[in-house]
Amino acid sequence: YTSCGVTGSAVGMDKIIMKAVFQSMGLPVLASTFCHRSEWQEDPAAVTARAEALGYPVYVKPANLGSSIGISRAVDRASFEQAMAIACAYDRRILIEKGLEKPVEINCACLGFGGKATPSLCEQPVSWEAFLSFDQKYMRGGGKGMENLARKIPAPIPDAMTRQIQDYTVEIFKMLECKGVVRVDYMIDPQTDALYVCEINTIPGSFAFYLFEPMGISFRQLVDQLVEYAHEALVQKNESTFAYDSEILTKMMNGTKSIKK
């Protein structure tokens, strides 16, 4: 298969674990807390206190969903309570993340396998206000997908910032043992120019091909490369041994057979 294996896919599906991994790598992430649905049901005041310690606005996100489903922006206690009700309807674990005022979103994809990782150009989506909803991502322009969204490629940011984002993207790609194409999303605080890693998408819309095209990699070439990496991964898997002959295990198996007789 052409996409990530178990490790990258699992981390990419869990926003709470994902953020913990990014933090452990020393990457800049937005302040956050998390809770279980049962905590909110039993002691909403305690969860609210943790959220308000971050300071509004905050984003409330189901841990295991994508495409902005169940995500809400809370600017006060009333909207936070509403956001929690929405998120809890979708998941039992909820991420509560500090929000930025009018952040600049930057995305960067990466293509590779193993030690090989090629970062794409950076893009800046420009057709959003608070964040892209599910409909904005997939229903705009006749449902043609993410490639149809308005964006600036390359992103109009300093070269040093571009290189930093590309370096982070490659670092994340390798740490999570990714394969194929992934996309890592970032935010820049326009007030401080601080950069934050947001999340990784292990199966990005349209394979983020539009981020590689300006580099001279056509969609056909991208697909060919995905197939090649998938084959390379299979070859490497077949080179590994998955069986271990053990006298102890043999005796245990023989003993089990004797008992059955």
Model-assigned labels for residue ranges:
Residues 10-97, 101-102:
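Active-site nucleotide/adenylate-binding loops and adjacent lid/helix of ATP-dependent enzymes
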Residues 75-152, 156-160, 167, 195:
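Phosphate-binding site of ATP-dependent enzymes
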Residues 3-4, 67-68, 205-210:
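Short small-residue beta-strand/loop micro-motif enriched in glycine and branched aliphatics
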Residues 37, 125-127, 203-205:
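A short acidic/small-residue loop/turn micro-motif
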Residues 1-10:
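Short, acidic/small-residue loops that bind anionic groups at enzyme active sites
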Residues 1-2, 29, 58, 219:
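Hydrophobic beta-strand scaffold residues
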Residues 23-26, 156-261:
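ATP-dependent carboxylate activation and anion-phosphoryl transfer catalytic cores
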